[in-house]
UniProtKB/Swiss-Prot annotation:
This is Lysine--tRNA ligase. Gene3D superfamilies: 1.10.10.350, 1.10.10.770, HUPs, Lysine tRNA ligase, stem contact fold domain. It comes from the Bacteria. Its main location: cytoplasm. Keywords: Aminoacyl-tRNA synthetase, ATP-binding, Cytoplasm, Ligase, Nucleotide-binding, Protein biosynthesis. GO terms for biological process: lysyl-tRNA aminoacylation. It catalyses: tRNA(Lys) + L-lysine + ATP = L-lysyl-tRNA(Lys) + AMP + diphosphate.
Amino acid sequence: MKTAHWADFYAEKIKKDKGPKNLYTVASGITPSGTVHIGNFREVISVDLVARALKDSGSKVRFIYSWDNYDVFRKVPKNMPEQELLTTYLRQAITRVPDTRSHKTSYARANEIEFEKYLPIVGINPEFIDQSKQYTNGVYASQIKFALNHKKELSNALNEYRTSKLEENWYPISIFCTKCNRDTTTVNNYDNHYSVEYSCECGNQESLDIRTTWAIKLPWRIDWPMRWKYEEVDFEPAGKDHHSSGGSFDTSKNIVKIFQGSPPVTFQYDFISIKGRGGKISSSSGDVISLKDVLEVYTPEVTRFLFASTRPNTEFSISFDLDVIKIYEDYDRFERIYYGVEDIKEEKKRAFKRIYELSQPYMPSKRIPYQIGFRHLSVICQIFENNINKILNYLKNVQEDQKDKLINKIKCAINWIRDFAPEDFKFSLRSKFDSIEILKENSKKAINELLNFLKKNFEVATEQDIQNEIYKISRENNIEPALFFKQIYKILIDKEKGPKLAGFIKIIGIERFEKIVSRYI
C-alpha cells in the first residue's frame, strides 16, 4: 500500500535498507558560523518528520543534531559588531571567537543558543552533540589514529572526484596551533603510533600526542563519514550542493566504508527562497531569515505545515506578503478535513490527514481549534487596535482549551500587519475629524439613512442585508455605489478603500459606527 506521506516512505526505506534494529539513529547538523537560517531548518525538520514516521511505525529513534563548531572561522558576517576585533580571530575554531553582541559567550554558542531556543516551540527536541567538546576531550582519538593509518585509502577516495590530486605529503588531519590557535599549520610527520609533528606560519613547531591533544581534528569530508560510523547513523539528508555528482555525499559514501561503516539512507532537499521580504538567505552576509523570524508571522503548526506539505526535493518560497493569507487558509482547510468538518475524496483524505498530523508540534488537540480566517482576523486586530483581550471578547464561543493557539495566531496577525502587510491593507479607525471634505447633501442624507437602518436592524441584519441596503440607498439618492462606498471608507478610516464594508461595519459595531459618521451628517 502506498504510504500517506514522503516521511513514511523514507521510514519504511530505512527499516528495509538497515534491517530490524532496537534503535534507529537519524542525524542532522550544521556549522554555527552565523545565524542558523530557515534554509538550514529545512534539514532539521525533514529529519524530524522522518523520525516521527519511524516512531509512528513502532520503532525507537535517536535524533542527533551535531554542532560542527570545531570548524574554522573563515569570514566575518556583516551584521556583527566590532568587525576589526573579529578579523583577528580568522582561521581559529569558531568556538574561540567571542560573541561581540552579548559578550557573554562564544560567537558559535550564541548562534547555537538562538536556534536551540526555538526548536521545542515547533516540537523538535534532538540530542545536541558539541563537536568541539568531542574533539577537545579526545573522544575521536582512535578515529584520528585510524585515519592516519589509512592515509592512502582516504587519499584515493578523495582523489576519485578531484581534478587536482592531493599531494603525497598530504595528511588526513588539520591542526590548530597551540600557540596562535589558528589552523595555518603544516603536518610534517606521523610516527605511525600517536605522535604528530607540525609547524605553523607563526613560527611554532612541536609534536602532539593524538591521545591527549585538543588541537587535532579531521577535515570535514573525512569527519562527516567518520561520524556516520561512530554514531551508527541510519538516516541523514543533505542539500542539493552536497548531493551533486562527485560532491561531498559521493565522497563520504566511499570514505565511510574505509571506516568499516555503511552510508545512511538519504535524500536531497532543495533550497528555500523568501517572498515578500527581500534579501538572499546567507549566514555570512548576516542577511538571513531565521526560525524566530518565521514564527513571528506563522504559528508553530503552520510553520511545520509549510514543510510537511512540500516534498523535500521541491524548491519553495516562504512568503511574508499577501500569500500569508492563502497559506493560513490552506492550513485551515487541512484542519477541517482532519476533524471531519469538511469532506474530500477518500483517496486524498488519508494524505491530507497525515500532513495535518505531522504539522502539529506535539499531539493534535481532541477538538478542532478555533478557526478564523487570517484576513478576517487581520481586520479585527486593526479595529481593536491590537488589544488581545478586546479581540477575544469580540470573538464568539472561544473555549478555554482553544485560547492559547488562538492568541498565538492573533499575535502573528499583529506582527504581519505591522511589518509586512501592504499599505493598502492597513488602516485605523478615524480618531481625528478635520481632514474630510464636506459632503454633498444627498451624500449626507444617504449616510444618515444607512445609520438609521443599522440602528433599527443591526442585531438581525446579515452582512448581505447591509450590503444590499448600501446599494439600495445609493441608488435612491442618485449616488454611484462605488462613490458611496468610497465616501464611507473615507469617513471611517480616511482611505478610499478598505475591508469588505458590510463585514467591517458588523465588526466595528453600531456605537462606534454612529460615533464616527455622525460628525459628517
